[in-house]
Amino acid sequence: MLDLLKIYYYLFYRPKIFFPKKSYSLLGEDIFINNYFKNKSKGFYIDVGCYHPLEGSNTHLLYKKGWNGLNFDISDYSIKLFKFLRKRDISIRSGISNYSGKRE
């Protein structure tokens, strides 16, 4: 069991200490957004389909700079993670669509 913990440590925890992530989004979109707003230390974003507060996030880099915003996702699990990890944000479990009405 100890060997598994060592493997986990070296694969997942240690690299984050010595090599911090520069991008949290899937394809570096957050780097583009960060460069576009490089002189703004505070701001407001709306993230529709937010998925996860860290992995694949287009807004986490902005959050680290002091921004806050609204996060929408249909997954209850995702919204619970956002509420736990991003205290300055407002996270809402809801779908966004151009159709009115309630989904079954």
Regions found by a protein language model. Give the residues of each.
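Phosphate/nucleotide-binding beta-alpha loop and adjacent structural elements of enzyme active sites
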Residues: 1-104
